[in-house]
């Protein structure tokens, strides 16, 4: 039996269609505590957690929890079984986190984004970087990068932005050097440099093939800003599930002799961070930990690998 430190409020749970034979239509979604428990149990909705005991301080669930960290002997088919379990846990987490992040009001995301960029631009690693890789943000549910893109260019740094292209099945991306140094705040041309770029299947602008042929090679990017659905204090990251960043980073580091370049700086919303001193996000040996995690209220430097 698993006990939480405090009772999840019904108003915070979006995926419970029924509880104690009553119907609820809550306004927001589950706390991260509840989400991670459901993911560990392999549940698609929180009804299957079967609440059985409540008190003013404790909330109990009857299902056993599969630990995030598994030994090779804990599953009959060894590492393959562990990899399958991790994959399923991540799938469950993504499903529920997309609901959680998609319900954050846009004005709150804008507020948090400003704080995140203030923290990132204060990092000595940013000041020392000659080149920065930075994503263009999705319409909802993640840190907004519009002003950050302008700031990087305004600081005289070389900027690289992602391009996935049309072959989505390959799940590969390049980072393309931005030649245009216009700022969205330029009085003569208020439009951002990417205003006429085509949008991909996620409604994210990306460089067309004729904008620039300068594709980032090993050693070109000093600092890479990485998005994600969730992060933890051990540098764990949960991405969208396609592996674009993991493949790109692995290629850059492999080509660079495994030197650790570029520096990986994750940026996340308050609602995307899993508290705790130990790893909270399930990761396989193919998943790469972040070096720094930047949040609205702090920056976490990951001291050791997972």
Regions found by a protein language model. Give the residues of each.
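Hydrophobic, well-ordered secondary-structure segments
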Residues: 94, 113, 201, 242-249, ...
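N-terminal active-site beta-alpha-beta segment that forms phosphate/nucleotide-binding
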Residues: 2-6, 18, 37-220
């Amino acid at each position: 039996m698993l006990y939480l430190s405090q009772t999840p409020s019904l108003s915070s749970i979006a995926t419970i269609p029924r509880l104690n034979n009553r119907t609820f239509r809550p306004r927001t979604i589950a706390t991260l505590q509840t989400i991670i428990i459901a993911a560990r149990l392999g549940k698609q909705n929180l009804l299957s957690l079967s609440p059985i005991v409540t008190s003013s301080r404790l909330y109990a669930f009857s299902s056993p929890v599969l630990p995030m960290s598994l030994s090779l002997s804990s599953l009959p088919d060894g590492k393959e079984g562990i990899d399958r379990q991790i994959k399923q846990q991540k799938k469950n987490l993504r499903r529920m986190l997309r609901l959680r992040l998609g319900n954050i009001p846009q004005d709150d995301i804008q507020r948090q984004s400003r704080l995140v960029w203030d923290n990132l631009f204060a990092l000595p690693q940013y000041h020392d970087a000659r080149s920065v890789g930075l994503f263009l943000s999705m319409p909802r549910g993640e840190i907004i990068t519009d002003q950050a893109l302008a700031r990087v260019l305004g600081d005289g740094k070389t900027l690289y932005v992602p391009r996935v292209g049309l072959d989505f099945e390959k799940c590969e991306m390049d980072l393309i050097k931005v030649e245009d140094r216009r700022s969205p705040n330029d009085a003569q041309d208020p439009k951002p440099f990417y205003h006429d770029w085509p949008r991909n299947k996620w409604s994210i602008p990306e460089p067309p093939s004729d904008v620039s042929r300068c594709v980032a090679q090993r050693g070109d990017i000093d600092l890479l800003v990485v998005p994600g659905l969730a992060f933890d204090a051990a540098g764990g990251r949960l991405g969208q599930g396609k592996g674009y960043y993991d493949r790109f980073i692995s290629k850059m580091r492999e080509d660079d002799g495994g030197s650790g370049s570029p520096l990986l700086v994750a940026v996340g919303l308050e609602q995307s961070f899993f508290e705790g001193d130990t790893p909270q996000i399930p990761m396989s040996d193919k998943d790469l930990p972040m070096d720094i995690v930047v949040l609205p209220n702090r920056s976490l430097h990951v001291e050791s690998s997972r």
